[in-house]
Amino acid sequence: MSSDSTGHIFTPGRVRPVAKVLVATTAMLAFISFWRAAAIVLNDLASSAYYAGGEAEQFIGKTAPWFILGIMLFSYAVRAIYVESCSMFVRGGVYRVVKEALGGTLAKFSVSALMFDYVLTGPISGVSAGQYLVGVLNELFVYAHIPIHLYVNGTAAAVAIAITLYFWWENVKGVPESSGKALRIMQLTTIMVIVLISWCFYTLYARSGWHLPPAPLPQNMKLDKGSLGWLDRYQWAHTITLIAIFVGLGHSVLAMSGEESLAQVYREIEHPKLPNLKKAGLIIFIYSLVFTSLVSFFAVMIIPDNVRGKFTENLIGGLSMHLVGSFPVRLAFHVFVVVVGVLILAGAVNTAIVGSNGVLNRVSEDGVLTDWFRHPHARFGTTHRIINMVVAFQIITILASRGDVTFLGNLYAFGVIWSFAMKGIAVLVLRYTHPQDREYRVPLNPVIFGVEIPIGLGLITLVLFAIAVINLFTKPDATMAGITFTLILFTVFEISEHRMHKRQAGAAHVELDQFNLAQEAELTPTSVGVAPGSILVPVSTYYALYHLEAALKRVKGLDAEIVVLHVRMLRRAASGEYDLDPDQLFSTIEQLLFTKVLAIAEKEGKPVRLAVAAANNLWEGILRTAMNLQSSTIVSGSSSKMPVTEQAREIGLAWERMPEPRPRLALEIFTPVGQEYIFYLGPHAPRLTPKEIDVLHKMWLKFSEKLPGEELHHHDIIHFALTELEREIAEGQGDEVLERLRQHLREIQTRRLNPPVEPKNLPAKPN
């Protein structure tokens, strides 16, 4: 006989009563500064500078830099749409919010176009990285007189596949994204940009005869079958200036790819969120305007017309090799440009996988995709099926492109512009359906006869749709591929949603327990129903509940208070600015997880409390929950990605990032074979081994004999040793101390025993 999470008694032979699951509606977030937020977005947005200018010039000729500049200026207006979207107080994912605005059919098309965007981001970034890498390697081979010449497109495709597979495995393992890494990459990129722009200006100063690109007028543009596509047969497409301008903008829209990343990082930006979001947006605008547009202008002004065509897919590399200066210096800078480019472009490949995974997880949370897609990996607990599917699409795309960036750019432009256009129309409709639920509005909203007219938002959306429609006709291959992909994904969504509704309308799974979802803003001892000093057991996947079994076996009686917590990770994804509803946080995956939790609790005859919370950093979310619940102990399973000591170090770093006052907690980590490791979070007395205590006692005896009449305690010896160590470091002997410590650790490594284990009964309350 045992009790459920609310105190009911489990009696063999009768149906288990409905257990309560407390869902925290306020997400526990680890916040970042607007500088880091800008760096994350720029890692995605700046990658387009490596290929956008060259791709635009291939289609519309030497006027391309003006259109790139126009797109970069227009991007600030598009960014205002995302700022307004972030400021809205609405709940639901990428599908649910758009469905409310546009209806189910258009919402599915919107998500399908967005997925086309994400699926293409990886291949074009990976292939572009390969193009730059192959270009510099071939130049190095020539310079070193090595008789090797790499086939550019084929090798670029191989590099792209290698990068994609690397990040596929990283995402399957669940390696978290790092804002610090993004910031360091952008710092390195900034150095490269400053050197490049300064060197370009000096080159123009040193050379005479340079001139600006021709004005963006029809007579100066290359308007042919390649740039006009299906419109080439109509004479008006060659002569009407407005049409020509939209054609040019359509071929330059790749320069704006990555804008959607701003909304993805919104929830992570520190308070005050909206002002900091605007600051991040301004930084992104200035940086991308200077970098992307100036690269395009300098390429036309510095690289001779007769050779520039060779560098359309390696534009910055070609620019670096045509600056003034000696060849070795230019080649060295070219290598630096490529290293930075590969870092940025490879990061964009990872962003594409993370973003696609986030979007499809959101769609699954919205009830469109079945929970089969969100099935957790048996070892890592990640949504590996979604990741596998996305990466498979990306590798197929890379193989189909055969390393041709132009082919990929055409496809990518389809997804980019249509995802922007659908976002614009959704925010425009939400302006009327949720008129008060926002802190910010896109400017130009005159009130006529008491009715607000969103002129600014409407004009931006109209321009986006005009470019999108023009692109349908000027990029026939991309149109056919994009429509085919969108229809396939739309069909998958339609069938999957139908199955989900049918399942929800029918009988519940007989093998799954039913749960009563209770909502609270935060998890507290009162809301969960536990006293201070509880034991917090985080669980992520039903494949790994051995640590819960260990905790339940060790508690005494029925008065032990164990809280089982499942943290729903909030990924960076489209419409990530919208909070999830409680029912989206608790799907069939969580239902199955807690069903198994209750089965284990019933087997052990011990009660548990069940809770779900959302967070964007796993351990910071768990630690904040432990602090809110005033827990005394966290019991965790060992990580499948790192050793236990490294896992404990990561948790300790997360503890250090918490605001004061930080809770003092015992951390118990169990391995699948039952081995236990105990760590303490926060300052604590060290647990000395018997041998260490014996050494300390012998030293005390020796010093007591040498210092008769002095009051000497064991702790005085420890204090003296620490003070001497601190003095040596202060006197500049830190490196020597570090080396002695390293040598000591190596000497004891082979005989180091497992950490001593605490008494076998975990206290339900602090002693």
Regions found by a protein language model. Name each.
Residues K181, W372-R385, K423-L472, P476, ...:
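C-terminal membrane-solvent junction of multi-pass transporters and transport-like membrane proteins
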Residues G53-A113, P123-I163, Y287-S293:
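Extracellular loop-to-transmembrane helix junctions
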Residues V510-E676:
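Structured cytosolic domains appended to multi-pass membrane proteins
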Residues G103, E139, K222-L231, A280-A348, ...:
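TM-loop-TM module centered on a large, flexible mid-protein loop between adjacent transmembrane helices
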Residues M1-A52, S87, R96-E100, G104-T105, ...:
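Membrane-interface "cap" regions at the ends of multi-pass membrane proteins
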Residues D404, G409, V416, I448-K502:
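A generic transmembrane alpha-helix motif of multi-pass inner-membrane proteins
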